[in-house]
Amino acid sequence: MIFPVLHGLNGEDGTIQGLFELADIPYVGCGVLASAVSMDKLYTKIIVDVLGINQATYVPVMRDELTDMAEVVASVEAKLNYPVFVKPSNAGSSKGVSKATNSQELETALHYAAVEDS
């Protein structure tokens, strides 16, 4: 019986759980699907929405949208008031998290999140 006490990429994202399942090794904790979904913050928020659970308002921003930063900033500002917090969808814990109090800080935070996202 394996007790996976791992954190972050490959430890919490379903990778190691999938390896255990392929090798038919019993382990404790969440399975592959639950681990993979919960590691991705956007997927988790979508599921929480579908379940009707209240959560903070969020604006998903995809990496390819960052080519038109003015549009992204306008989209965020149309839905949220400053300060806003930016978090990569697939980075662990507080890695890549930034607080932005204006449009310039938001641009910087979005670029930083894109770099830190796994």
Where are the predicted features?
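Conserved N-proximal alpha/beta basic substrate-recognition cap immediately N-terminal to
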Residues: M1-M62
